[in-house]
């Protein structure tokens, strides 16, 4: 077994609105990975056709409801990986790495860390239709808090750096605790990053999930399980791979309404234990697929407008 065989990439492809940008970004992402082992989980909504051609490296799953499925899909993929896989990198299918040796570097860092963010800086590229627009540069979460630990206590996304895009951890962590998969409008990467450093009730988290809400309590239980697994493995804290990541354009960030979407979910009283049905080997389902939460989710995903040609910086 080589070190290269020990790490697999898992990514997801979910395109119920049929965005052209998402298809093209996935093609560029997958091509850039080269021969690095990668399993793509494609999720089709209801009776929509799958877009990716059949392949041993594509796991097709069908969802009943329109919601944020990414973390659930990644969790379902883990059992499909070969036993030679000891580390898993979960990566958004719209990024490109500047540093090609990131897999080896990540494995070295995972000898002592719970998880590794696979970049130190991200460049959000402009729309291909507006190539003269300036890219937006952002420091990564782990690089930021390593250099400025006080950034964690500020309670603002822009203060502590970007929490998303590309991470890696031990397969055994994902088998025992999984990723947190009940953020049904997204932002799981943000709240998980705080849990990785032992702050599951940080201001950033309570702003998104609510203070003393059922959603927050559900997240705290997952966080406690994660820390227990980390202790049993003798790993802790976070590392990062120094290097730049390019994020391919797919619509205006403002159309994703990062804070507003979670605020609305709180107003609707979302409780994962009550409102989600966990079916083995399937994406999550809503218990009430015609209720106010389902209606909100359908409207939200329809308004993301990922084929738009302008972008703006987000603060959450």
Place the predicted regions along the sequence by residue.
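Conserved catalytic core of nucleotide-sugar-dependent glycosyltransferases
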Residues: 98-199, 211-221
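Short beta-strand-to-loop acidic/aromatic patch adjacent to the donor-nucleotide binding site
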Residues: 84-98
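A conserved acidic beta->alpha catalytic loop
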Residues: 13, 18, 25-26, 32-34, ...
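C-terminal catalytic/acceptor-binding lobe
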Residues: 2-5, 15-23, 29, 183-316
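Short glycine/serine/threonine-enriched helix-capping/active-site loop
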Residues: 41, 116-121, 241, 248
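Active-site-proximal specificity loops/subdomain of glycosyltransferases
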Residues: 42-85
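Active-site acidic Asp-centered loop
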Residues: 43, 90-94, 119
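Hydrophobic targeting segments
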Residues: 5-11, 30, 36-41, 77
